[in-house]
Amino acid sequence: MDQIRLTHLRQLEAESIHIIREVAAEFSNPVMLYSIGKDSSVMLHLARKAFYPGTLPFPLLHVDTGWKFREMYEFRDRTAKAYGCELLVHKNPEGVAMGINPFVHGSAKHTDIMKTEGLKQALNKYGFDAAFGGARRDEEKSRAKERIYSFRDRFHRWDPKNQRPELWHNYNGQINKGESIRVFPLSNWTEQDIWQYIWLENIDIVPLYLAAERPVLERDGMLMMIDDNRIDLQPGEVIKKRMVRFRTLGCWPLTGAVESNAQTLPEIIEEMLVSTTSERQGRVIDRDQAGSMELKKRQGYF
């Protein structure tokens, strides 16, 4: 990795640390949304750097759907314990009582009830006025036009036509009671930046990002990894072992794997150099309806 690239990564690192410190100083009750993915791992690493040698001045929040990969749950608990972080886990009790799941109710309803409503419940329960998220502008078009400080009204809704100007590194965090801000310290990072920084800083990640033989089946053009026994096979479906990895992680029935032989970080970085598709191509929730992500964000999704 040449000096120019190192400088670029250090500039991104400095910007993100500045944003994290700014929020911690400006808001009374911030929280870091922790989805267990690679971006969350980088964001947590940056937060620990921002306040080293002290501890994080805010908790981590995982909005659990009950459908994450088992390796994600194991990684979450291990990471929180290793770093001494306060970890809050919230699962929508109404959704649990209704038995909401992606197979029976579909991705849109599952995401709305278990993720969007679950997140709003948690933010209201603890009274958080700022929430860090690991979203990046290069991931998806609605995120590309969102500010680093993303204003949300008292119902946690986002209005893309009512965003605040951000001149240089000056951010407007003024809010009224009941309103909040979603903050995205990784907005200017790319997927390639994330992977190079993970390699440079030796950041621990969920093993699912690395290629291995895993049990998968093809459904609706997606390679679905079978993580437990909560699936009913459709006629003609066969579970096969294939060499796959994940570019993005979410609920296992809604997250497609990609065929790959990249078993190390340098191999992933090399693979990304020739990739022509978005990492979120395997996320069903991004395409379950027209303008899917923007509609979800307007309703309160992160």
Swiss-Prot record:
Name this protein carries in UniProt: Sulfate adenylyltransferase subunit 2
Species whose genome carries this gene: Escherichia coli (strain K12)
Catalysed transformations (reactions): sulfate + ATP + H(+) = adenosine 5'-phosphosulfate + diphosphate
EC top class named in words: transferase
Activity control: Stimulated by an intrinsic GTPase (Probably CysN).
Gene3D superfamilies linked to this entry: HUPs
Residue ranges of coiled coil: none
GO cellular component: sulfate adenylyltransferase complex (ATP)
Top-rank taxon: Bacteria
Keywords from the UniProt entry: ATP-binding, Nucleotide-binding, Nucleotidyltransferase, Transferase
Subunit structure: Heterodimer composed of CysD, the smaller subunit, and CysN.
